[in-house]
UniProtKB/Swiss-Prot annotation:
Residues 95-108, 171-189, 223-233 have a biased composition (Polar residues). GO terms for biological process: protein polymerization; protein targeting to vacuole involved in autophagy. The keyword Manganese does not apply. A motif (LIR) lies at residues 661-664. SMART domains: PB1, ZnF_ZZ. This is Protein NBR1 homolog. It comes from Arabidopsis thaliana. Zn(2+) binds at residues 291, 294, 315, 318.
Length: 704
């Protein structure tokens, strides 16, 4: 280029710093600069001492590294017609410095210039620094070194220690000096013998002394007996916990040394500890465990599990601030096998994916092996009497009986009760104690749950919700209800001579009980002296067999009134599993007694002429009830009602999907999702997956 004909661009690299300048070219083709002037120029550029011994090299036109020694070498450079001249500078020991120290002396013969002495050590350190940071560090170092060299002898001695920083990763041998050849050099003149940092002490003395703490608050001269550096077993250089000056362990004034591999929060206010095991434990992660103090996930280092609160853990930082030693258990290592339940703590030991309740398993001895988290639970089996939609007279007392099964993993103890949880209140008490034997109700056993009610005075539809609970009020199990229709026209329809009949108790196969009174419900209390009352205990069984459409229609229109005709002698009374009984008035052409679950059925039962009309009325009534419960899809409700023969209980179960959803709904309520209608809809959408429901609720899923 034209610019190189008049001047030559010279680039000088030293300590990772690159400087450039131009040197004019004379008419005879030689540089207007001699070798001495070039060294002075380089020393001025990098703030080097004037008497520093500089070793200059460059790459010739063939790519070989050539040394610049005298003016003849500069003349040869101009003859090569290079586009630019890049010079690599290596600074050596000053020519005016004292003789090198002997290997057996503990102190040098003379104190060299501190700045020139530390240059090589810093240069070696900078070689390991990434390129983006190398230029910045070099400039800062040059400024500090030039200003601090004349400040005090103490600073000079500190700089002497810093000059050995580059030797910390070199394995120490028994010889006091170890020659190191810098990469890229091509001659004996370019090699430099770097004195070993351990040359001031005997190896045997260093081995016996070991590492000793260094107090940096004392003058540097106080450490004349500091042991030498012990080589690192890993071979990866100096440890962060070592002093870079002598290789000894540092005694930080701060109680917690900074660990660069950890989160910075762990350094600020972690527990004071000088034990090396503490820092080792910080590498332990408790997967899936969140600190309930600061919210960090997962907990790193020791985990402190509360003995007082359930599912409460603290990390080391929060424990040092708010923890009490007696209330927490320290866990230095994570649990080897830990199944994490996303919502309600750990899984039971024997989970069953098909059931909502834990399944106890028998051990070799035959005793049931309880789950790790046993719980009380109950499941509705059937309505023993007063099925949904029963028509009663105003102010008529009656007893509702539900058959419930113990579906949990604990025995129902004495004191278990059923409590009112919502809906219409037409019972004199908010809770009723159950008749439970001393040994309790075993698992998978059934119990008749009885509650006395009094029908409201005003006509209309009434529903009351109940749920089982422990003696201390903790509710459990499925929700049950009683649904009645109060009809004012039935109040005066009962014949006085039958006022002693009480059909709250299911009829028993007793010869003293008149069969012609089956199915009649009296709105008055039973007279103590009445001989027609059989107060036996009701024992219900599961419904079996099919129920016809006529039976389903009449089931929803159970009338309370009088009945004069007698039942034919050939018919036997219904079993205790009967859900309803129907009695026609005298004006009707025949008397019907229908049994919902009995194996014995009536013969030649006539179908009422108004069957279609009544069936339509029942369907409309049940559709309204389902809509009030939250089931808004009318077509689906009709289909479910017809499939279940207008049995409201079975229809609700079918609309919910499966009865096992009740525990999931309870769990969603405990998590704060209290809209049962939305929860059921999302459970149906996600096929009973609680994870899918929670994700939809958290993402703001709205009902279409």
């Amino acid at each position: 280029m034209e610019s190189t004909a008049n001047a030559l661009v010279v680039k000088v690299s030293y300590g990772g710093v690159l400087r450039r300048f131009r040197v004019p070219v004379k008419a005879n083709g030689q540089l207007d600069l001699e070798m001495a002037g070039l060294k002075e120029k380089i020393a001025a550029l990098f703030n080097l001492s004037a008497d520093a011994e500089l070793s200059l090299t460059y790459s010739d036109e063939d790519g070989d590294v050539v040394a610049l020694v005298d003016d003849n070498d500069l003349f040869d450079v101009t003859n090569q017609r290079l586009k630019f001249l890049k010079i690599n500078v290596n600074a050596g020991v000053s020519t005016n410095s004292a003789a090198p120290e002997s290997s057996g002396s503990s102190t040098p013969a003379g104190m060299p210039n501190p700045v020139s002495k530390i240059q090589k050590g810093i240069n070696d350190v900078l070689m390991a620094v990434p390129n983006p940071m190398r230029d910045t560090i070099s400039k800062v170092y040059m400024d500090l070194a030039s200003k601090a060299s004349t400040s005090s002898p103490v600073v000079g001695e500190m700089l002497d220690c810093i000059s050995k920083l580059g030797q910390l990763s070199i394995p120490q041998e028994s010889s006091p000096c170890s020659p190191v050849t810098k990469p890229g050099s091509s001659g004996a003149s370019l090699s430099r013998d770097v004195p070993s940092a351990g040359g001031k002490k005997d190896i045997s003395e260093r081995t016996q002394t070991g590492r000793k703490p260094v107090n940096l608050n004392e003058p540097t001269g106080a450490h004349s007996k500091t042991s030498g550096h012990v080589p690192n077993s890993s071979g990866l250089g100096a440890n962060f916990n070592e002093c870079p000056f002598s290789g000894s362990t540092m005694n930080y004034s701060c109680p917690n040394p900074v660990n660069l591999n950890k989160h910075p929060r762990r350094v600020c206010h972690s527990k004071k500890s000088t034990n090396g095991d503490y820092w080792t434990s910080l590498g332990v992660f408790h997967k899936g465990i969140r600190c309930d103090g600061c919210g960090v996930l997962p907990i790193t280092g020791p985990r402190f599990k509360s003995k007082v609160k359930e599912d409460y853990d603290l990390c080391t930082i929060c424990y040092s601030v708010m923890g009490n030693e007696g209330d927490y258990t320290r866990m230095d290592k994570p649990v080897s096998v830990q199944h994490l339940h996303p919502f309600r703590g750990p899984f039971t030991q024997f989970p069953n994916p098909w059931l909502s309740h834990p399944v106890p398993r028998a051990t070799n001895g035959g005793a049931p092996l309880r789950c790790t988290r046993p719980k009380l639970d109950s499941r509705f089996v059937l309505d023993v009497n007063v099925i949904d939609g029963t028509v009663v007279a105003p102010s008529a007392p009656f007893t509702k009986i539900w058959k419930m099964r113990n579906s949990g993993s604990l025995v129902w103890p004495q004191g278990t009760q059923i409590v009112w949880i919502g809906g219409d209140r037409f019972c004199n008490s908010l809770s009723v104690d159950l008749q439970i034997p001393k040994e309790g109700v075993p698992i998978y056993s059934e119990l008749d749950v009885k509650v006395d009610f009094v029908a409201p005075e005003l006509p209309g539809r009434y529903i009351s919700y109940w749920r089982m609970a422990t003696s201390d009020g903790a509710k459990f199990g499925q929700r049950v209800w009683v649904l009645i229709h109060v009809d004012a026209s039935l109040k005066n329809s009962v014949v006085n001579e039958f006022h002693g009949l009480n059909l709250n108790a299911s009829p028993s196969l007793d010869e003293n009980f008149p069969s012609e009174f089956l199915g009649i419900m009296n709105y008055e209390s039973a007279q103590p002296g009445s001989s027609s009352v059989n107060p036996g205990t009701v024992k219900g069984t599961d419904l079996e067999g099919e129920v016809g459409e006529t039976q389903a229609v009449e089931k929803e229109n159970l009338l309370v009134g009088e009945a004069h005709p007698a039942i034919p002698h050939g018919h036997s009374p219904s079993s205790s599993s009967s859900s309803f009984n129907m009695v026609d008035f005298p004006s009707m052409p025949a008397v019907e007694v229908l049994s919902g679950g009995s194996s014995s059925t009536t013969k030649d039962v006539p179908v009422p002429l108004q069957e279609d009309i009544e069936k339509n009325d029942v369907e409309i009534t049940m559709l309204k009830e389902l809509e009030e419960m939250g089931f808004k899809e009318i077509d689906l409700n009709k289909e479910i009602l017809r499939d279940n023969e207008y049995n409201l209980e079975q229809s609700v179960d079918a609309l919910c999907g499966v009865s096992e959803w009740d525990p999931i709904l309870e769990e969603l309520q405990e998590m704060g999702f209290c809209d049962d209608v939305t929860n059921k809809r999302l459970l149906k959408k996600n096929n009973g997956s609680i994870k899918g429901v929670v994700m939809d609720l958290l993402t703001g899923e709205k009902e279409a």
